[in-house]
Amino acid sequence: MPQRTQTTRHDCVEGWSCIGKWTGVPLGLLLDRVRPLPQARFVLFRCFDSMDGPTLDGRDSRYYESIDFDDARHPQTILAYDLNDRPLPVANGAPLRCRVERQLGYKQAKYVSSIELVESFATIRGGKGGYWEDEGYEWYGGI
């Protein structure tokens, strides 16, 4: 698939920022290939890292995040696999990180293990669309 390289600033909700050169596949191109069902409204990313440890009730404890189709199709939203002309380091989200340049860092899922297209978050963990959203953060973390 075609790739995109972009130099952008990462803004953290904690107040720090940094600039990096990211390369990856535009998420919009991937969505065009899979042809989402009409009822799909959100792109949900499940990640390899666990935030809560094992749960007794069988819930998935892995980090997860979501964006809507407008952000998913934005030209700067990519599934990044390179950072600064090198393979993406584990510390920065390898094997795959979703870069959503119009939103704060907590919306940019690292260690992506799977991608789902969903209509609702109602049955996914806390029902708010992401790990931090379930903890009280806003669902749209725009900058």
Residue ranges of model-derived segments:
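Structured, non-membrane catalytic/scaffold regions adjacent to prosthetic-group chemistry
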Residues: 1-143
